[in-house]
Regions:
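Hydrophobic, well-ordered secondary-structure elements that form the walls
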Residues: 78, 103, 156-160
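N-terminal segments that mediate ammonia production and transfer
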Residues: 1-96, 104-144
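PRPP/pyrophosphate-binding module of the type I phosphoribosyltransferase fold
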Residues: 136-166
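Generic non-transmembrane alpha-helix signal with a bias for helix starts/N-cap capping motifs
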Residues: 96-97, 166
Length: 166
């Protein structure tokens, strides 16, 4: 079991489907069984999964994350609410890439990778202190000077946990 399909791809496993609301999945020597414990009245998928945690090569809640309509629409809406003049739109990689693309699409301001992310530094929001979070952030992102120097930049960040990267 996994919260997104990329985990299955990594081990060449078959994706069967999502765990339903109110459903229990039992895997034992007899195989896999599904049991509906209760029927929830309303479906409320985790917003963090869709806009923050999920990898772009996954399917969650029945929809591909890549070119996520939700993530791109956030960027489009951001431009509509806060239009500005700039030379480039830069995401804080990787989870805000789609939102930055949406901002770029709506504004017609070119999208550029002006920050390079180290994939050796993990999630920063889980660190227990702000000092540790700040230390990891400095090591996690490096400005791409060839892209950003002398430019007016719209920096798009979707960090909704602590807002530390800004």
């Amino acid at each position: 079991m996994a919260s997104e399909t990329a985990a299955f791809d990594a081990v060449n496993a078959k994706y069967i489907g999502e765990v339903g609301r109110g459903e229990l999945i039992i895997v034992d020597k007899n195989g896999l069984r599904r049991k509906q414990l209760y029927q929830p009245e309303e479906s409320l998928p985790c917003v963090f999964e869709h806009i923050y945690f999920s990898r772009p090569d996954s399917i969650i809640f029945g929809s591909p994350v890549a070119n996520s309509v939700i993530r791109r629409e956030f960027g489009r809406q951001l431009y509509r609410i806060h239009p500005t003049k700039a030379d480039i739109v830069v995401p804080v990689p990787d989870s805000s890439n789609d939102a930055a693309l949406g901002y770029s699409d709506e504004s017609r301001i070119p999208f550029e990778f002006g920050l390079i992310r180290s994939h050796y530094i993990g999630r920063t929001f889980i660190e227990p202190t702000q000092t540790l979070r700040d230390s990891k952030i400095v090591r996690k992102f490096n400005p791409n000077r060839a892209v950003i120097d002398g430019k007016r930049i719209v920096l798009v960040d979707d960090s909704i946990v602590r807002g530390s990267t800004m």
